[in-house]
Amino acid sequence: MKTLLLTFLVVTIVCLDLGYTLICHQVHGLQTCEPAQKFCQKRTTMFFPNHPVLLMGCTYNCPTERYSVCCSTDKCNK
């Protein structure tokens, strides 16, 4: 009986997703998101005319800009 309970406990712990955080691509490497950051983003913006800048990483909400991608799975913003 103890073996059965121990097995059940181990399976329960393995199946639970304790402390899961999202992983997103940045321009250089990967970023582990804060628990409240539920989305990865990839967007192109222009700070100066004819000079596009690529922004990638974790975000709290999805950008609504025209040239942006938002997703919610690990490494989905490549």
Swiss-Prot record:
Site entry (Key residue for inhibition of muscle alpha-1-beta-1-delta-epsilon (CHRNA1-CHRNB1-CHRND-CHRNE) nAChR), positions: 44
Gene Ontology CC annotations of this record: extracellular region
Main location: secreted
Protein name: Short neurotoxin SNTX26
Record-stated family: Belongs to the three-finger toxin family. Short-chain subfamily.
Task of the protein: This three-finger toxin binds and inhibits the nicotinic acetylcholine receptor (nAChR).
Marked site: Important residue for inhibition of muscle alpha-1-beta-1-delta-epsilon (CHRNA1-CHRNB1-CHRND-CHRNE) nAChR: 45, 47
Organism: Ophiophagus hannah (King cobra)
Chain positions of site Important residue for inhibition of muscle alpha-1-beta-1-delta-epsilon (CHRNA1-CHRNB1-CHRND-CHRNE) and neuronal alpha-3-beta-2/CHRNA3-CHRNB2 nAChR: 28, 43, 51, 66
Subcellular compartments: Secreted
